[in-house]
């Protein structure tokens, strides 16, 4: 599942801010890819008003699009 951080957590509880961080979301409009597990679904449910979620194909691995490779090569994908 693809999770996008859409609304700031400022003014919301520490619990919700911690959940956003635990999902790996750091800045607005950042995107993370996670496996569709009950744990992740519960975290998303808790902050559903701050994020948007898209289902992605099962053949996409979580590491394929996390952005870690973008940071290593300066944002250039080839």
UniProtKB/Swiss-Prot annotation:
Keyword terms, alphabetized: Ribonucleoprotein, Ribosomal protein
Gene Ontology biological process: translation
Keyword check for Ribonucleoprotein: yes
Any GO molecular function: structural constituent of ribosome
Stated family: Belongs to the universal ribosomal protein uL30 family.
Complex formation: Part of the 50S ribosomal subunit.
Coiled-coil blocks: none
Lineage: Bacteria, Bacillati, Chloroflexota, Chloroflexia, Chloroflexales
Biased composition (Basic and acidic residues): 69-78
Residue spans of biased composition, Acidic residues class: 58-68
Entry's Gene Ontology cellular component terms: cytosolic large ribosomal subunit
Gene from which the chain derives: rpmD
InterPro entries for the chain: Ribo_uL30_ferredoxin-like_sf, Ribosomal_uL30_bac-type, Ribosomal_uL30_CS, Ribosomal_uL30_ferredoxin-like
Region spans: Disordered: 58-78
UniProt-recorded name of the protein: Large ribosomal subunit protein uL30
């Amino acid at each position: 599942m693809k999770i996008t951080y859409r609304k700031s957590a400022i003014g919301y509880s520490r619990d919700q801010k911690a959940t956003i961080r635990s999902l790996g979301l750091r800045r607005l409009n950042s995107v993370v890819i996670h496996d569709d597990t009950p744990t992740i679904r519960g975290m998303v449910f808790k902050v559903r008003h701050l994020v948007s979620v898209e289902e992605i194909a099962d053949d996409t691995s979580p590491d394929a699009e996390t952005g870690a490779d973008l940071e290593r090569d300066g944002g250039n994908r080839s």
